[in-house]
Amino acid sequence: MVNLKLGKYGVWAKKYLEEYKPFKFSRLVMDGSVMDYLLEFEYHLKGYANLVEFELKQKFPVPSENENFVEQVNYIYMIQEMVDEFVKDEIKLV
C-alpha cells in the first residue's frame, strides 16, 4: 500500500492528486514513480511547514512559563492549525 511510508503531508498530497489531478496521478502510478514523487514532495512540504512554523512563532510569541498549561496547549494547537492551512495551500502545487 502506498500510504505505509507517507506522513500526514504525503497522504494529503496523494489525496489531492487523486481528486484534482487524476491524469497526473495515473501517469505517476503507471510509471511506477508515484511513491518517489510523493516522498519528495512531502520532504518539500515538511521543510515549508518548518519555515512557516518558525515565522509564526516569531509573529506570535510563545506564552510565558507562568501562563497556565491550557494556554500553552492552545498556543501549540493554534500554531499547528495555521501551519496546516499554509501547507494545504502549498499542496495545490503538487
Question: Predicted segment positions?
Answer:
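Extended, charged helical/alpha-beta scaffold domains that provide interaction surfaces
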Residues: M1-V94
